[in-house]
Curated annotation (Swiss-Prot):
The keyword Iron applies. Keywords: Heme, Iron, Metal-binding, Monooxygenase, Oxidoreductase. Its EC number is 1.14.-.-. GO terms for molecular function: heme binding; iron ion binding; monooxygenase activity; oxidoreductase activity, acting on paired donors, with incorporation or reduction of molecular oxygen. PANTHER family: CYTOCHROME P450 (PTHR24305), P450, PUTATIVE (EUROFUNG)-RELATED (PTHR24305:SF190). It is an enzyme of class 1 (oxidoreductase). Its cofactor is heme. Pfam families: p450 (PF00067). Belongs to the cytochrome P450 family. It comes from the Eukaryota. It comes from Fusarium vanettenii (Neocosmospora pisi). The keyword Kinase does not apply. Heme binds at residue 453. This is Pisatin demethylase.
Amino acid sequence: MLVDTGLGLISELRARLGWAALLQIVPVTVVAYNLLWFIYTSFFSSLRKIPGPFLARISRVWEIKKAATGNIHEIVMDLHRCHGPIVRIGPNRYDFDTMEALKIIYRIGNALPKADYYIPFGLPSSPNLFDVQNPARHSAMKKQVASLYTMTALLSYEAGVDGQTIILKEQLQRFCDQKQVIDLPQFLQYYAFDVIGVITVGKSMGMMETNSDTNGACGALDAMWHYSSMMAFIPHMHAWWLRLSSLLPIDVPIKGLTEYVEQRIIQYRLKAAEFGDDDALKGENNFLAKLILMERQGTVTSTETQQAVGLNIGAGSDTTANALSSILYFLYTNPRTLRRLREELDTHVKEDPIRFQQSQSMPYLQAVIKEALRLHPGVGTQLTRVVPKGGLVIEGQFFPEGAEVGVNGWALYHNKAIFGNDASVFRPERWLETKGNLNIGGSFAFGAGSRSCIGKNISILEMSKAIPQIVRNFDIEINHGDMTWKNECWWFVKPEYKAMIKPRAA
């Protein structure tokens, strides 16, 4: 609708004025608008005293330039260290790093809507559970698939995860025997993809066994996050670009993964049709089988099935892979912590792989996971919400309707006022101590409130399986070779390093 209106307006102006006049008017209008906005925000707005970069006061160019460096998470942390709990990152965008702001902005009741920033993370004509902006619509969509994420459902996926965790151990042993330097974060993404493939469509993608990016899925997701995280700053251009790309011979990176998902959906529908009833699917412990059953019962549509499957694979694999990579990095570069975790595992774990319910009763393991997610939250950008009618008071400052506000997880989790002077230190023990509101922010790595990640327990299931398996059997020499620890933020903050797998020494 917006694309058609915009194209119609341009055509009408061109017809009335001609191209020459139109090309003169557009830049003058843009300059005039930004000048007037600067005058308003500098001298008349109630938010004029909020600190931040000068360019961010009048334009989104500052945020776009910083995001394009792949280092926006570090830059926003530095802004908060310099200016305090509220900083301006755009003409109408404000970032926070406090628990008070988190509880207000991501409240469960009367939830704030997501900003237009999220539009490029899906299709404008068919919003998914992640990018849908309206809270009521999100609630309705979430109810449709909530049964797939219950604890009962989670435990039904465990056997499939066990199978892939055993393959993980076997492949790491092969790297160990060959004394091979590997891109460990990349291999952990293969593990995450294979696991989420089994959970979602009932079949591994075979990445670990081939040590390769089958279907180009990893590369496709990287390209998608690059695109969406930058297009998010000009979200209404997303629909224009999609229309343009459909008319040009442009390669679509996600094509291989999309075809894989579509093939599995077709196979399951044919399987259900062949038997003529639901019995063929009831014994299958994966998302797709359950969704096809829901389709046949009329509770979800075929489009919603495809959306749910695609979102589960896309978001689930990167979230888990990045978390596993950071957990192992912090563990194997902190020998004291590694020793304490091994003591807990050696004392209490007899099964191989560990049972999920047992892992949940192991306090130090869970503290290690929480602490790694604190130091390295998966998402490096602000989780943006729009202030509703009537405005909001956050950190003592009134924000009018329409202002875009949010908390950056990296800034929050590195805030010394919350986590102490050792906020930048990997110390899992902090989660075993009782310090007031510390645990309130403990799950913000997966978002907060009604819009927190619906699949977070699946990610925790994978972590709780893989980490004990690796720690009990292997030593890892981090930064072996010419690649040191590096992070790049394209929505997700992806760790990069190389490692050598070795037999456990003690």
